Regions:
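Structural/interface elements that position substrates and couple domains in central-metabolism enzymes
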Residues: 1-116
């Protein structure tokens, strides 16, 4: 499972109170393989999980190495994610928890979650 965004909000490396960290912990308990990307918070995350998860330097790599992906932090670069990129996921399932993307492509499974 690929996670895009680890910090509690964009433009910071702060992972304290980050939902992403709690989700990683839960996924690891369920024996899931987790792969992550974040422009700034990778090193702070690595201090917690060490080699228990995989780390990507480029967010695009998440799509080639994951069954599904979840957007957790609304980083500016993630707004460039295309349905073509999502189709590289084995399940073609992409979950946007921040409602920053919109797709009309019937060949992918796109779920947009959020409050309101």
């Amino acid at each position: 499972i690929g996670l895009l965004g680890l910090s509690f909000k964009e433009n910071t490396d702060d992972i304290r109170e980050s939902v992403s960290i709690r989700l990683i912990e839960h996924l690891l308990k369920k024996k899931c393989k987790v792969i992550v990307h974040d422009p700034k918070a990778i090193e702070n995350t690595r201090k917690i999980f060490l080699k228990k998860i995989m780390y990507c330097k480029k967010y695009e790599d998440i799509f080639e190495k994951s069954d599904c992906a979840v957007l957790m932090t609304p980083w500016k670069d993630y707004k460039k994610i295309s349905s073509k990129l999502i189709k590289k996921l084995q399940s073609k399932l992409f979950i946007d928890t921040r409602r920053i993307l919109e797709f009309d492509d019937k060949e992918i499974i796109f779920i947009s979650l959020g409050i309101g």
